Design a protein with these regions (language model features):
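Active-site core segments that coordinate phosphate-bearing ligands/cofactors
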Residues: 1-285
Length: 287
């Protein structure tokens, strides 16, 4: 919140990395209790509704590693930064509804969707528009799918948001993650030059505030002394992008049972064949 200057009412920040969360500063308490929404506060005590998702970019990272392995096998030395840039920019060429593709980047369970374990999935029909652009776009869109469900809960409580700021690793490549997030939130999303900075920088700003606030509120200190005229770059989604993401979300909600079935049918066990016998063993988690 502090690192993105999102401590005033009707502002919010979205952090997107291995996991993701949206923190919206509320004008009043929510009327109902929602287990999907965590209630916290800003450092100055304003009430915040937090939508937290356990999964975001891990599956994207895994797919980028596959592309990296492929390019290495061709004898090409391409940096991961270059791969991310090329692949994320390719996503911008995809259909707004992701071409009928579906993915769940669930490396772990997801409370908001009622899934208790993770099975990363990529699913398509024979008629889906399967190309690289849609493949990358679906994984970016899916990274914000569970969060969108949580934000819909806040919307049902008539929570008003004037400004959303994104930060975290997924925004290091300009535009792609930001534009798809804006489509998911159905609202403008701003990303600052400090998008890659997070908690450590926010803590440093709080320390500076405690030492040199001159009677100012935290909100005014950040606005006047820290961020000043740095308003970042804002992307507003088009009507077509919003409509496309809504179509994707309908598919995402309906497909949750596929994820649940995969959990039941696909157990994390490996198979070792030894002297004509088959022995099963658990595969250690990489996390």
């Amino acid at each position: 919140m502090v690192a993105t200057n999102s401590v005033a009412k009707r502002t919010g920040n979205i952090s997107a990395g291995t996991s993701a969360f949206a923190m919206i500063v509320l004008e009043k308490e929510l009327e109902n209790v929602h287990p999907e929404i965590d209630m916290v506060t800003t450092p100055s005590g304003e009430l915040v509704g937090m939508v937290h998702t356990n999964n975001c970019s891990s599956d994207i990272n895994a797919w980028v590693s596959i592309f990296e392995e492929f390019t290495n096998s061709l004898g090409m030395e391409i940096s991961r930064d270059k791969l991310f840039t090329v692949l994320f920019n390719k996503a911008l060429e995809g259909d707004t509804d992701c071409g009928g593709l579906l993915s769940y980047g669930y490396f772990s369970g997801e409370n908001i969707t009622g899934v208790n374990e993770g099975r990363p999935l990529f699913v398509r029909t024979p008629g889906s528009r399967f190309d690289l652009a849609n493949f990358m776009r679906i994984h970016l869109a899916s990274a914000f799918g569970a969060m969108r469900i949580g934000m819909d809960i806040l919307k049902s409580e008539n929570v008003q948001i004037d400004r959303l700021v994104g930060h975290g690793g997924i925004f290091k490549t300009p535009e792609a993650g930001q534009r798809i997030l804006a489509s998911a939130m159905e609202a403008p999303v701003t990303v600052m030059d400090t998008a890659g900075e997070g908690g450590a920088w926010g803590i440093a700003l709080l320390a500076a505030y405690m030492m040199d606030r001159h009677g100012k509120s935290l909100e005014n200190f950040l606005a006047e002394d820290v961020f000043g005229q740095d308003q970042g770059i804002t992307i507003t989604p088009s009507a077509e992008e919003i409509a496309g993401y809504q179509i994707f979300m309908s598919r995402y909600r309906e497909g949750i049972d596929i994820e649940k079935t995969a959990i039941h049918q696909l157990q994390e066990k490996g198979v070792i064949e030894n002297a004509g016998t088959t022995e099963r063993r658990s595969i250690p988690s990489k996390s």
